[in-house]
Amino acid sequence: MQGIACSVQRTVWPCQEPGAILSHLECPPEAIVKFALTAPLIFALCFTFLAAAPEEKSPKPQYDTKGNLLRPADYRDWMFLSAGYGMNYSPSPGSHEMFTNVFVQRWAYQEFLDHGKWPDETAFVIDERDAQSKGSINKTGHFQTDLMGLAVEVKDSRRNPDKWAYYGFDADGQTAEAMPRGNGCYACHDAHAAVEHTFVQFYPTLKPVAKKFGVYNEAREQVSDAK
């Protein structure tokens, strides 16, 4: 939380000369009572402003000296958008079915709610986890288990000529190099994402927001074969 400098103006009562020290010997009782009643209110207002101060726009993407993206820390505390299971954009069956959990920074999420667009330094993290069907009392369906890796999408027009860049992390990887321009992820998002380079068509809480601002590409919601 960004701190706010808060100051209380010094009150000079009628019985005081400038620079004099306030004491019960120099001021009448009513002045002492007035000070005692107003001081707590002033300090309470200061603490209220501090508590209501907006959080700093963080976390933002961080990079090492080589320009590699650092693994986003505490991304599980970000805004959860949606989860998929066994999603595959190709007609061919995937080699492994897994859960994909999508997170975005809370400040970026709020910007989208307010303006219908993703600001620079927005980062999406796709948390990829193994799926299991047998365990504990479960009899049907699947549940999530171990982390398999992270896929990260970053919007940064100052760093990326194409605005959006894509990164892949192993389960325990700490840095990742941006995928080359023209990579498959970029091409797929560019051709099929409903809002900018993001698959808002799969995020039920954001679809109505995008439609309200007129930025939702309805055609991208239609069933089609990804190429």
Where are these regions (language model features)?
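Short, Lys/Arg-enriched N-terminal segments with co-localized hydrophobic residues
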Residues: 16-32
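Bacterial N-terminal signal peptides
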Residues: 36-48
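Bacterial Sec-dependent signal peptides at the C-terminal "C-region" and cleavage site
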Residues: 47-57
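Sequence context surrounding c-type heme c attachment/ligation sites in exported
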Residues: 55-57, 61-64, 71-79, 83-88, ...
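N-terminal post-signal-peptidase region of extra-cytosolic proteins
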Residues: 98-113, 136-138
